[in-house]
Amino acid sequence: DLGQTPGDIVVLSAADTELAALAQAQARRLTDDPSGPSLRLANVMHLAHNMSVDLYVDAVIRNARLVVVRLLGGRAYWPYGVEQLAEAAAARGIPLAFLPGDDAPDAELADWSNLPRPAQHRLWQYLVQGGPTNADRFLDYAAALISGGNDDALDPEPLLAP
């Protein structure tokens, strides 16, 4: 049990640096707008056992408004978690995106997601490109997705210009 309370946006990743960047972006957001969506971050490696997945789904996922999971190694890396999160999201109508943990598309993860593919791709690209600006844009876009507006989302900024 990670001991987390429910949040509007939940992001799971095995990359601590990615989670730290999103935590810093959330701190910046809350400075500007303390009433903005809440964020819960967790390292998926802390949810390795089926029971920990079940507890997390019950305590956090079922109450989320958007769930984003980034998995290196695809569904095979975390099959029980993928199945349980997909089931909970379907039952509760929660938008869910399973994203590859690297820069290669993963059709199987996309198929387990219920968020439209363009939205999945945009969220993924914010994380692939990295950096503070893209972390801010990731959270801005996530907030727009849960509020019903996303037409004015800024494109991911390439971390390294070609």
Label the model's feature ranges.
Residues 1-162:
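An N-terminal assembly and electron-transfer interface module characteristic of large anaerobic redox
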